Amino acid sequence: MGESGSGKTTAMRNLPSKETFYIDCDKKGLNWKGWKKEYNVENKNYWSTDSFSVVSSLMDKVDKQENFQHIKYLVIDTLNGLMVAEKMRILAMQSGDKRSAWSDLAQNGWALINKALTLRDDLTVIILCHSETISDDNGIIKTRIKTNGRKLEKLVLESKMTTVIWSVRQDGKYKFILSADGSTCKVPMGSFDTDECDNDIMIVIKALEDY
């Protein structure tokens, strides 16, 4: 998780493109030189969509289809891109049950996280999210995954995740925060000796190989 411009997408730069399927839910492309040669429809490792149903279908394909078994990393960038797009579609509804549609938004977000937990064991799912820093009724400040809708806020998406990393830019340097008071970031016990590391998802994946 991280604010816009904190290096979330850039942190994916060292993933092996031949073993990675990238779902671009923000529809803005990736942000390192030469990415279009690595990730494209022709290579069957890139798709741009802001539809929950399409993302769910792609997850099923990567998980089960024989011609996708070489894929070891699945990136969803970002969950917020899906939620915001769905929110805009609901707001544009001229008819229908908007209350039900808002419930569907929360259900779709929760279902996507749950589906990620059920995919094959040799597939690492990386879900990028925006972060927000809020103050609760007691004045306690916390940084967490930004969600759309009160139902998802109450559910706490991080509770379904084994690892939550906070991408930040401090003093001109991009890095990952692995553990910090007042945040929901977390890594398995013993996986790191420090509370931060370089902005590179492969460092995290390597550290988690035994978990």
List the model feature ranges, each with a label:
Residues 1-75, 80-81:
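Conserved P-loop
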Residues 11-14, 65, 116-119, 154-158, ...:
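A general structural signal for short secondary-structure junctions and capping/turn motifs
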Residues 17-20, 120-123, 159-163:
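Short glycine-/polar-rich loops that comprise or flank the Walker A/P-loop
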Residues 33, 86-87, 171:
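Hydrophobic alpha-helical membrane-insertion segments
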Residues 73-155:
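P-loop NTPase motor core
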Residues 125-198:
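Phosphate-binding/switch region of NTP-binding enzymes
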Residues 194-211:
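Charged phosphate-binding loop/patch that engages nucleotide di/tri-phosphates or the phosphate backbone
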